Amino acid sequence: MSDTLRRLGEVLESRKLANGGDPEKSYIARLFNKGDDAILKKIGEEATETVMAAKDARAAGMTDEARSKVVYEVADLWFHTMVLLSHFDLTPDDVVGELARREGLSGLEEKALRKLQARDAAGD
């Protein structure tokens, strides 16, 4: 994991109310204070903005400016998903671990495995 993501994870932890985060002084603490519904709403907004930036970039012929807008919006989306992870006491390492678990497994194999696991769970 990059140092930037690790440091951001540490900042997020420090902004939790239990760790002294102040909603009056910190945007992150304010999101934590509002709860997961507010965080999820923000993720939805950022996901929509990411989709729109990508569509705009495609329509603009992938200019440098349009590509930069996509990166900007994805950064917002990643940031807010990291807020959610922290809110649920998860870390970027948890996500990296899941990605590592999937490495070398095709998407079709992954989907088939999930269906099999769901069927097994329903039959138990």
Curated annotation (Swiss-Prot):
Its EC number is 3.6.1.31. It catalyses: 1-(5-phospho-beta-D-ribosyl)-ATP + H2O = 1-(5-phospho-beta-D-ribosyl)-5'-AMP + diphosphate + H(+). InterPro entries: HisE, PRib-ATP_PPHydrolase-like. GO terms for molecular function: ATP binding; phosphoribosyl-ATP diphosphatase activity. CDD domains: NTP-PPase_HisIE_like. Pathway: Amino-acid biosynthesis; L-histidine biosynthesis; L-histidine from 5-phospho-alpha-D-ribose 1-diphosphate: step 2/9. It is found in: Cytoplasm. Its main location: cytoplasm. Gene3D superfamilies: MazG-like. It is an enzyme of class 3 (hydrolase). SUPFAM superfamilies: all-alpha NTP pyrophosphatases (SSF101386). GO terms for biological process: L-histidine biosynthetic process. One of its GO terms (cellular component) is cytoplasm. PANTHER family: HISTIDINE BIOSYNTHESIS BIFUNCTIONAL PROTEIN (PTHR42945), HISTIDINE BIOSYNTHESIS BIFUNCTIONAL PROTEIN HISIE (PTHR42945:SF9). This is Phosphoribosyl-ATP pyrophosphatase. It comes from Ralstonia pickettii (strain 12J).
